[in-house]
């Protein structure tokens, strides 16, 4: 199981430090219960808010929380937080220990990558700081559009494209094309959401 593999990897590096909010505890413990039942484990509940040293099972449970403000966006941020903290721990290990973590992961997860490809990628990944893991669109909101279902809406597309060019290319004076402007207007007309309607999901 990929889930169990990640939990085992977190345990191998000594757990991760995560700030758990009071509102998250109920859902976190529900997922811990599911984890224990599925994998025949006895992972303890998290009983208080604040900075916590989570073991593998607790960290996986934390990363599954979605039924709070922010929904899937907030869940993605929790997953990124766990991965970031895990890599901080991996950097503290010596080379042989690092290789063992990734080798064990390879043996227990489903992937199309070869083992050598994974190990080479791991060598590169541990050199990077994963603190800024925001995604496009930067300013957005969620809305149900009937037959189209739940959608992520850029607020607005033109504004997001300007931000993208500034962030990726360092272009502070980028002017969107007429095509981008046209699509941006169409999205506003169809959804009713403008750049002033972006929801703060706490990501970057």
What spans do the regions from the language model cover?
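Extracytoplasmic/periplasmic, Sec-exported soluble proteins
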Residues: 1-2, 51-55, 71-79, 93-97, ...
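Active-site-proximal beta-strand/loop segments in catalytic clefts of secreted hydrolases
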Residues: 1-3, 21-23, 66, 136-141
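Surface-exposed patches in mature extracellular/periplasmic domains of secreted proteins
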Residues: 1-3, 20-23, 94-101, 175-180
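Extracytoplasmic/secreted envelope proteins and their assembly/folding machinery
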Residues: 3-7, 11-13, 56-60, 79-80, ...
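Flexible, polar/acidic helix-loop-strand segments at domain edges
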Residues: 7-97
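Generic alpha-helical propensity signal that fires on short helical segments
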Residues: 16, 34-36, 78-81, 101, ...
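Generic detector of bulky aromatic hydrophobic side chains
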Residues: 24-48, 69, 93, 98, ...
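C-terminal solvent-exposed extensions
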Residues: 108-204
